[in-house]
Structure formats: structure tokens, C-alpha cells
Amino acid sequence: YGPVFSVWLDGACGEGPNGKVQVYDWQRIYDTVRALAPEAVISVCGPDVRWCGNEAGSVRANEWSVVPASLREAERTAEKSQKADDGEFSRQVASGDEDLGSREALADYCGPLAWYPAEVNTSTRKGWFHHDAEDSQVRSVDELFSIWKGSVGGNATFLLNVPPNRHGLLADADVEVLARLGDKVADFRSRRIDASRVDDNDDVTLCFDAPRSVSAIVLEEDIAQGQRIDEAVVTSSMNGEEDREIARVHCVGYRRIITLETPVTATQVRVTVTKSRQGFYLADAYGIEA
């Protein structure tokens, strides 16, 4: 089967016929994974990757990887939240909270922080298991592509469940939509616009060799240096004319795909970081052709 790269622990714990509820020895599970598959990440009820808070494929407008460390405990409780009460900070910290890591969310927080990036998880169908009657209800490629852009392009990882049927095979409907999704992702990546890059303090300017129709901007921080950008303004211009604002975001992370409502024609796109946490490291920035 190849190497184990992820161990997904969702915390589900139903009662047995005698009414007894299983109690998990979480630390023993973690220690076993670390010993047998040290490169694997432990997700959801684990210390490495957190649940985004829903199973619909919805994403936050601004996803932070630096969050209260108590979120590492959040999914271990039956009510799916963890009460943090250490004398310095007392509030309910839940995976589904809309704002987990902004300056405002952390303003009164005195507890420890953790690098705990999010995972968006959903299914090709309305549920996690295969039912023959749902073969005509597989999600459309456009919907899945939108979720991909929002998650992978929103500083989160993306887990897409594809349920096998009773024969251990993937249904033709799922296979078809996956192939089409792969084509759309490949097409998106192939439309990267070649540009020269000029860095000047808080500005990163992309200069095109000719007017280009831009439908999206992709920004990527060097997360080895942390997640630092609090706000960035994107502007465009034609042949040295005055810049006009086309987008504004409040965090970036390892990747932020900014899809423009209407493509813009430009010879230059500038990203200005207006707020950051002790500077920033923008590893990559590029436009996507319409």
C-alpha cells in the first residue's frame, strides 16, 4: 500500500450493546504512530492537523495556522469543544469558530499557541459511504473545484472522501468526476502568467511582458518562517497608469488563491503587505490567465 502518510482520528465513539462507551488512550495511539510511521501526520484528534469544523467543504474567509494550543484537545470531547481554563484564559475554543487566529481573536489570550494547520474534509457524495441509489448524485466537478480552490487556496489541506462500493471498487460516476477535477486543476496551474518580480520593502510587483487578462492571483508565504501576513492589498495597472485596487485579503499562509469577480487586463500587478507580524516572507506570487 505504500507509506502511511496520514492517520485520521475523528473521535467517533458510539456505545456498545451494553451501553459502555470506549475510552481512547490518545497518547498511546500517538506514540505508536510516531514509532511506526514517524513521517505521518496525525489529524483531527491529534497534534498535527486540525479539523476545519465542518464536513461540507466550507472554508473560513481567513484561515490561520497559529491558533490556541487548546484546539489540539478540542475534538477529544463529546461536545466537540474544549474548555480552556488555566487561570489566564477562559473561554470555549471550538474547531468551528469562524476566527481562530487573528489579532482580534488572540487579543485577550495569554495561553500557549500552536502551529496547527487546518484540513478541509468532505465527500464526493452527500455522505461518507457508497449507496447505489446515489450514483446520480455525485457532486459536480465545478462544486469540487470550488472547494479545492477554497481549501488548497485558503491555507488548508484538502481531504476528499471517495467511497468504494460493496465490491471494493470506485463507482464510475465518482471516477469520472475525479478525472474531470484533475483536468480542471491541471488547467488552472497551466495558466500561470510569466512575470518578472520586483521586491521593494512592503511591495511585491509582478511585471508582464504584455497586457494580460488576469482572473486570479496566487500568494504563498514561506511558512518555514511562520505565517505573518495580516493584510495585503492587490492592485493592477496598465502601462504605468495609476494602480487600482482589485483585492484585499487578511491572511495568506502557505497558499492563498484570490479569485477575481471579474478578470482585469493589466501589465502589472502589485501586492502591498499593509499589516504583518514582524515582517513577511512571500515565497511566491503569480497571476492566473483568464
Predicted feature locations:
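Mature catalytic domains of secreted/periplasmic carbohydrate-active enzymes
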Residues: 1-240, 244-262, 272-286
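Short, conserved beta-strand segments of beta-strand-rich sandwich/propeller modules, principally
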Residues: 268-270
